[in-house]
Design a protein with these regions (language model features):
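Conserved SAM/AdoMet-binding glycine-rich loop
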Residues: 5-9, 210-214, 347-454, 460-462
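Glycine-rich beta-alpha loop elements in corrinoid/cobalamin-binding modules
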Residues: 11-14, 18-54, 72, 127-131, ...
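Flexible glycine/acidic-rich beta-alpha junction loops that bind and position SAM and/or redox cofactors
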Residues: 37-49, 220-225, 374, 426, ...
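Conserved Radical SAM active-site core
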Residues: 43-45, 50, 59-181, 206, ...
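N-terminal [4Fe-4S]-dependent radical SAM core
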Residues: 152-156, 164, 271-313
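Structural recognition of alpha->loop->beta junctions
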Residues: 227-250, 408-416, 472-496
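Canonical Radical SAM [4Fe-4S] cluster-binding loop centered on the CxxxCxxC motif
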Residues: 307-344
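Short, electropositive alpha-helical surface patch
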Residues: 377-382, 387, 466-483
Length: 554
């Protein structure tokens, strides 16, 4: 018997396992817990895009097409033809569909177009639900008729047939019968995972009622802290808030007892006498006490990339060392509770992951990498003659010196991601970014001179931002792209995030009112607020305009 089965639910990146479950698994195993893993996300996609399922969907689509002969039939028929090409390709070589991301230029890849059409046709019988594949980013997003931030909608979705409901049930059942765990832990990280996660829990509870089901992860810690819907607990036994390693280990130990004491497990939320109750907080595990992520939990050859192109996630520190940006959820403990490890220990963990997995691309997923720690890692990569490419998120920082950046480049740094947000001094100050335009110019110059490409992130529609200020920022960004100082720029419309300084004190940022969907009780972000400056409609229009203008530069 396995103690615990850890599940990564749909929908997240199909090109690699997310890091949360491997981190949990490594810690639990170091404490003597027997652990099994199920990446339900990739197993779903393998079933959803299998020749057998696509043939079924094609048949359903052709029936539906006859009903739509007078409304868009030409477009649908074009997609059906594309699906038939995909079916031919997959039938000839079943593995080919799961290696489509190996192209170095996905936007020009016919295979990517086939995948996009294949997803579109596979989703057609489930309209209005669908999965949207963005070729330029590789992300697959889930669009549902149900609201992901609403407890009542979650409960409704469980009772309905969805894109995933029939396909995941046999996968879950097979895994549980094989591993025979007494506890299942589901890692809920992204909003697109919410509805499938609760369906997963419902399947487990209906077929294996004696199994203890617990959920944790970034979404749970951010959006379900004050859960008031007791009915949710008919499908789960508990939630774990914030860092889950020590609480989950404690929970497994309690569940082995004849009379478990859930009240003794820290960071836990469970139902007691019909009401959700919270146990006391627990200090997170010191980063130096965490072992290397256990990617051996999953078979890496099941993802839609091969080892040569898989960018495996690796986290160095926890939280953000700046933790003051006004738009960020800085009141959540896993953001504000920053902790960084011994640099040499982290390098040894990195070396272990590379040796055990055989990957040659690493994505350091820290909110903001610490320049000194990255310097040590880069030095050791060179010293040990490790041949990898790596990317990382950085803040604009005076510690990004010419010498450090040249070292990063020599060690294999392939790209640097920078959250810039704005190039207007007033807006930067309101954001409390702790950076100036001079620092931005200085950093971009030395990064460019080192030969490392830059991906920058920008925001449109920050509270009180005017159209002139937004255009001023964009014009500067446009010039940087034109002069090849920035490789890529990603624009997004501003949203008010829960637990951020702006959400907690909106009046300080010129916000007069914030409109939230009354059905959404799980602290959703909001793009609907009233403030001086441009309207929300104008912000959206400008964002689309800027994206289009930058796309024309390719």
């Amino acid at each position: 018997m396995t103690d615990i089965l850890l599940i990564q639910p749909p929908f997240s990146m199909p090109d690699k396992p997310y890091i949360s479950v491997p981190v949990l698994s490594a810690y639990l195993k170091s404490k003597g817990v027997s652990v099994a893993g199920l990446d339900l996300n990739i197993e779903f996609f393998r079933e959803f895009l299998s020749p057998e399922h696509l043939h079924v969907c094609l048949g359903k689509t052709e029936i539906r097409l006859k009903e739509l002969e007078n409304s868009g039939a030409d477009n649908v028929q074009y997609k059906i033809n594309a699906l038939k090409k995909l079916l031919t390709s997959v039938s000839d070589n079943k593995a080919s569909l799961f290696k489509l991301f190996s192209s170095s230029r996905p936007s020009n890849s016919h295979a990517f177009q086939l995948l996009k059409y294949g997803l579109s046709l596979a989703c057609f019988p489930y309209y209005p639900e669908y999965l949207d594949f963005t070729i330029t980013t590789g992300y697959i997003r889930y669009h549902s008729q149900f609201k992901k931030f609403s407890s009542s909608h979650i409960l409704k979705s469980i009772q309905c047939e969805t894109i995933y409901s029939r396909l995941i049930e046999p996968i879950i059942s097979r895994s549980i019968k094989k591993e025979n765990p007494f506890c299942v832990g589901i890692s809920l990280t992204f909003p697109d995972q919410v509805l499938p996660t609760f369906k997963c829990a419902q399947i487990i509870k209906s077929k294996f009622p004696d199994i203890f089901v617990v959920m944790g992860g970034a979404f749970v810690s951010t959006h379900m802290r004050e859960i008031g819907e007791a009915e949710i607990f008919q499908y789960i036994d508990a939630l774990i808030l914030d860092e889950g390693e020590a609480p989950l280990n404690h929970l497994v130990s309690e569940l082995k007892k004849s009379e478990p004491d859930l009240g003794s497990v820290p960071n836990l939320c469970y139902l007691d006498r019909g009401r959700p109750v919270h146990t006391g907080q627990h200090q997170p595990v010191i980063v130096n006490d965490l072992p290397a992520p256990d990617y051996g939990l999953f078979s890496l050859d099941r993802y839609i990339v091969n080892h040569e192109t898989m960018a495996l996630l690796f986290r160095i520190s926890r939280g953000c060392y700046w933790k003051r940006c006004s738009f960020c959820r800085t009141e959540i403990s896993f953001i504000k509770g920053h902790s960084s490890p011994d640099a040499e220990l982290i390098f040894q963990h990195l070396k272990t992951v590379i040796e055990e997995t055989g990957v040659s691309i690493i994505h350091f997923s820290d909110d903001a990498a610490i320049p000194e720690i990255m310097e040590h890692i880069a030095t050791q990569i060179i010293k040990n003659k490790i041949s990898i490419k790596w990317v990382a998120n950085f803040r604009f920082d005076n510690r990004l010196t010419t010498d450090r950046l040249r070292l990063y480049k020599e060690s294999g740094c392939h790209s640097i991601y920078l959250g810039l947000e704005s190039l207007n001094p007033r807006i930067l100050k309101l954001m409390n970014k702790g950076i100036t335009e001079d620092l931005v110019t200085k950093n971009i110059k030395v990064i460019k001179e080192s030969g490392i490409p830059i991906v920058a992130y920008m925001i449109v529609g920050f509270p009180t931002e005017t159209e002139d200020e937004a255009r001023e920022s964009f014009n500067k960004m446009y010039e940087m792209r034109k002069n090849n100082l920035i490789k890529k720029c990603v624009y997004n419309v501003f949203e008010v995030a829960s637990s951020s300084p702006i959400a907690l004190s909106p009046e300080k940022y010129g916000i007069k009112s914030i409109a939230y969907d009354q059905e959404c009780d799980l602290l959703p972000p909001s793009s609907k607020f009233e403030a001086d400056g441009m309207s929300r409609e104008k912000a959206t229009a400008l964002c689309n305009e800027f994206i289009h203008a930058l796309d024309q530069m390719k």
